[in-house]
Amino acid sequence: MKIAVLPGDGIGPEVVREALKVLEVVEKKTGKTFEKVFGHIGGDAIDRFGEPLPEETKKICLEADAIFLGSVGGPKWDDLPPEKRPEIGGLLALRKMLNLYANIRPIKVYRSLVHVSPLKEKVIGSGVDLVTVRELSYGVYYGQPRGLDEEKGFDTMIYDRKTVERIARTAFEIAKNRRKKVTSVDKANVLYSSMLWRKVVNEVAREYPDVELTHIYVDNAAMQLILKPSQFDVILTTNMFGDILSDESAALPGSLGLLPSASFGDKNLYEPAGGSAPDIAGKNIANPIAQILSLAMMLEHSFGMVEEARKIERAVELVIEEGYRTRDIAEDPEKAVSTSQMGDLICKKLEEIW
C-alpha cells in the first residue's frame, strides 16, 4: 500500500505531520504498513525546482495507490504567469493528470460546536450533515478557448453527456447510502451547459428510483444553504458552482480546519478543504483535524479500511466533545491547544477507543 505524500505550502507540512502520526497508530493497531513516498508540489516545488509540478512528483503520484496532499499556494507566487502558479500549474495540473473528476466534501456540524457556527443555533437545528459532489474535470476552469489581453478576458464553459453522467452516478451512489436525496444545482434558465446538465441528470436519476432528485438554481442554492442547510443531503453540481458552494457550506461548522475532502479519479487525491493559510504557517496553531479526517477518507475509499476510518472520525469527535480546541474554533484563543497538541490528543484517543 503506497501513499504519495505531498505536504505542499503554508500550513500543509504541519498538518500533514499530525495526520501521519495518526496513520502510525493505525499501522501499529492493524499490523499493516503503508509505504509513504514524499514529493513536492506548488510553491514548494517552484522554490526548489522552478516548476509547480516536477516530473519526479508526477512519477511518485502515478506509482502510488493514493495521493495525500497538504495545501498549495500563497501570495509569494501570485506574480508568476498563471500557468506557472502553484494553483494552476500545480494543483489543477495534477487533477488533470490523474483524471480526477469528482470532489467529495462532507460537511458536518458537531453538536458540541454548534455555537461556533456563524449561523444561529435555530438555523443549524439538530445539526447539519451534507456532502457536496462537485464535478472537477470540466467546466469553465478547463474549457477552451480561453485567454486574456489588454481589452478582454474570456473563458468557456463546456459540459458533455459522458462527463455529466459520470458525476451524477457518483452523487446518486453516495446518496443511496445516506438519506437518499440528491439536489442538483445548475443555472439552466440561462446557460446552455446547464440545460444539458439538467437533462442528463434527470436521465441518470431514473436508474435510482429510491433516491429523490430535486433541481435548484445556483443563486437560490446559495441562499438556501444559509436559510436552511439541514434540508440538503447530497448536493450535485458543476466545477465552478461547486467551488463556490462547497466553500460556502464549509463555513457552516465555523472553520475550514474541520473539513476534509477527496477527489476521485484514476487515483484518488485526499486533501483538507481549506487553503495554505500562509499567515499562520510555522506557528503551530493551525487546525489539523481536516487533514486527519482526509486521512480517514483515504483509508476508507482507497484502502477499504472502513472500520479504521470510523474510529479516526470517532476519536476526533470525542476530543472535540472533551473541550479541546485549536485557535480557529476556540472561544478563548488563549486556552487553545497547538497543532501538535491536537494531533497528540487525537492519537491518544484513538489508542484508547481501539
Swiss-Prot record:
InterPro entries membership: IsoCit/isopropylmalate_DH_CS (IPR019818), IsoPropMal-DH-like_dom (IPR024084), Isopropylmalate_DH (IPR004429)
Major localization listed first in the record, in broad terms: cytoplasm
SMART domains hit by this protein: Iso_dh
Annotated residues for binding of NAD(+): 74-87, 275-287
Pathway: Amino-acid biosynthesis; L-leucine biosynthesis; L-leucine from 3-methyl-2-oxobutanoate: step 3/4
Gene Ontology MF: a single term: 3-isopropylmalate dehydrogenase activity
A Pfam cross-reference name: Iso_dh
Gene Ontology biological-process annotations: L-leucine biosynthetic process
Residues binding Mg(2+), per UniProt: 219, 243, 247
Record-linked PROSITE patterns: IDH_IMDH
Domain of life: Bacteria
Assembly and binders: Homodimer.
Similarity remark: Belongs to the isocitrate and isopropylmalate dehydrogenases family. LeuB type 1 subfamily.
Name used for this protein in its record: 3-isopropylmalate dehydrogenase
Native organism: Thermotoga maritima (strain ATCC 43589 / DSM 3109 / JCM 10099 / NBRC 100826 / MSB8)
Gene: leuB
